[in-house]
Curated annotation (Swiss-Prot):
Protein name listed in UniProt: Diaminopimelate epimerase
Single Gene Ontology BP annotation: lysine biosynthetic process via diaminopimelate
Species this chain originates from: Gloeothece citriformis (strain PCC 7424) (Cyanothece sp. (strain PCC 7424))
Gene of this entry: dapF
Subunit record text: Homodimer.
Positions annotated to bind substrate: N13, N66, G76, N77, N164, N197, E215, R216, G225, T226
């Protein structure tokens, strides 16, 4: 038995996309997703994304398994790839076409742009301790420049949920961060009961941030869309950045805007098709 798939990437954050429109649950188990994501013995990816039928209020549903088999609520680069994949399935190239996508992190609305770009209305950032979730503060408080001890060092962190948890810390030089050592300690810190994604941000200008990320369930990746969104929100909350920023990641740049009008965060970036294939079970 073989499973047809298409591989996409958003700034090097790569995914296996599967057409799952004829079933209400992912056709691949978390264990199989781990095998498919293996870069030596499988296809190789940061995660597997499934396009499932939508509800009466949405066009489609998005589900994801990370490369470790865990299931995140949302993925910013992944939803851009999902939008391009849906357009491929629907055989449309209509610029301005949008989709209402149901995710475990809430409703997301990606819109197709020219030149393989996708803009996503990521919705409202969630800032309360109970919404992250984290025990760094009370359930009704915001986490802004809160101290935390990690790897024998004190860090000031700001926490934001974009449908999934993010812990953001601003540093002088992102290159100097030993991400492979510090990242897992943030992810599994006792203050984050559902674990966390962690972004290390260097402010080059108020409208230009440089970011490295340790993703919950995936480790070091070349890009994280929700992380870029959360980082701009954190930058505004701490007075370090503008509401409209370019965020530079190892895989390229994203344009992020936290609107004062509706409070939503908007992300624009690429989603590129790599290849199609059949994975033999």
């Amino acid at each position: 038995m073989g499973i047809e798939f298409t591989k996409y990437h958003g700034l090097g954050n790569d995914f296996i996309l599967i057409d799952n429109r004829h079933g209400s649950e992912p056709m691949v188990s978390p264990e199989m997703a781990v095998e498919m994501c293996d870069r030596h013995f499988g296809i190789g990816a940061d995660g597997v994304i499934f396009v499932l039928p939508g509800t009466s209020q949405t066009d489609y549903q998005m589900r994801i398994f990370n490369s470790d088999g865990s299931e995140p609520e949302m993925c910013g680069n992944g939803i851009r790839c999902l939008a391009q994949f849906i357009a491929e399935l629907e055989k449309t190239t209509e610029v301005g076409k949008s989709y209402r996508i149901d995710t475990l992190g809430g409703l997301m609305t990606p819109r197709l742009e020219a030149q393989e770009q996708v803009t996503v209305d990521m919705g409202l950032p969630r800032l309360l301790g109970s919404e992250i979730p984290t025990t760094l503060v009370s359930r009704t408080e915001k986490v802004i420049d809160q101290p935390i001890e990690v790897a024998g060092q004190s860090w000031l962190v700001t926490c934001v949920s974009m449908g999934n948890p993010h812990c953001i810390t601003f540093v002088e030089d992102v290159k100097s961060i030993a991400l492979e050592t510090i990242g897992p300690q943030f992810e599994h810190h006792v203050a984050f009961p559902q674990r966390t994604n962690t972004e290390f941000i260097e402010v080059l200008r108020p409208d230009y941030l440089k970011m490295r990320v340790w993703e919950r369930g995936a480790g070091i990746t070349l890009a994280c869309g929700t992380g870029a969104c959360a980082s701009v929100v954190a930058g505004v909350l701490t007075g370090k950045s503008d509401r409209r920023c370019t965020v530079e990641l190892p895989g390229g740049c994203l344009s992020i805007y936290w609107s004062e009008t509706d409070g939503h965060v908007y992300m624009t970036g690429p989603a590129k098709r790599v290849f199609t294939g059949v994975y033999e079970m």
